[in-house]
């Protein structure tokens, strides 16, 4: 199976989307997206350990996984209470999935996991150009009418789309179907676009498919667009996350702006796999970025850099800031 997702249209009415509080429990703030005429449900969760993970690139190894446990478990509890998860089947898309504590969180919240499936895919190149993705390893289990649980970083989204299409085809061949799909992600706006389109496709042959429930940690970020290396000239298109055009959890925004360096990092999360397993490569990437900034310091437009990282022009009125942040429906004390 080879597939490459080419459409990158902007989300319709994104400027009209607002975040509204859903719950605040056990130190976890949860917000829901509304106003976008979505087919699916989208949430943003914010918690002290996930904020530390994203604001401190020196959090590495097992701590990357451990940082997500509290927020994930609390969201699992919420989804169980809302009856969004009944019988669960975990899909591990290697190796990004290994950073997400889905099985542990299900265990903590007394959600039975019927099976765990594993997949991996690799990029396909022709004449030095990426032409698609190919499934390299696959061990699938079919749990009819179940909730498929996935944890993955979504930047461009090609890997996720490729694997989901493969799984859905597999279920159809087995004469089975999925009730819904719950996705936990550190990811960007591209994920919303992709999942809306996928739900439309899936409902053609599974009309009763309830859709995706997507949980973003700390915000729905944006990727630098193709050909855009950022004001610094160092950023990687379709890989590096930043705030512009996204929706950021208020507590994460507040914590980041109360510190000196995190806002200017190359990426909100960096390479999740390297950060967990090839720590030396992660550290080298962080240092290479900051050394690159130092080398370019005299030529970088500081005002443009600040506006890029904040995601809006300066100066900005409070009313315009609320609108730009999608905070208009939040209590002003938040």
Report the location of each language-model feature.
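PRPP-associated nucleotide enzymes
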Residues: 1-334
